[in-house]
């Protein structure tokens, strides 16, 4: 696959996209578009929550908020 076709396939937007990242410790990080990332149920609200508004074609805006981390809860961590 050429570099141009790789970039073209990446730049196609999907409104219901969801990204997830698993670490070696078994905890996971899951984030959908315009959502708050959760670091897993074993470490609720540890560190800053990542508020992400992602537009793959244009840019990635990340803002870190320590205040949001204190009150942010993951949907799976009840």
Swiss-Prot record:
Top-level taxonomic group:
Eukaryota
Q: Name one GO biological process term.
A: sorocarp development
Q: Could you tell me which residues belong to the region Disordered? A: 1-31
Q: Which InterPro entries match?
A: HssA/B-like_chaperone, HssA/B-related
- Protein family membership: Belongs to the hssA/B family.
Protein name in the entry: HssA/B-like protein 29
Q: Which organism is it from?
A: Dictyostelium discoideum
């Amino acid at each position: 696959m050429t570099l141009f076709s790789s970039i073209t396939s990446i730049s196609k937007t999907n409104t219901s996209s969801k990204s997830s990242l698993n670490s070696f410790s078994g905890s996971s990080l899951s984030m959908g578009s315009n959502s708050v990332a959760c670091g897993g149920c074993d470490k609720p609200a540890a560190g800053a929550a990542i508020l992400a508004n992602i537009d793959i074609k244009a840019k990635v805006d990340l803002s870190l908020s320590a205040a949001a981390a204190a009150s942010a809860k993951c949907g799976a961590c009840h």
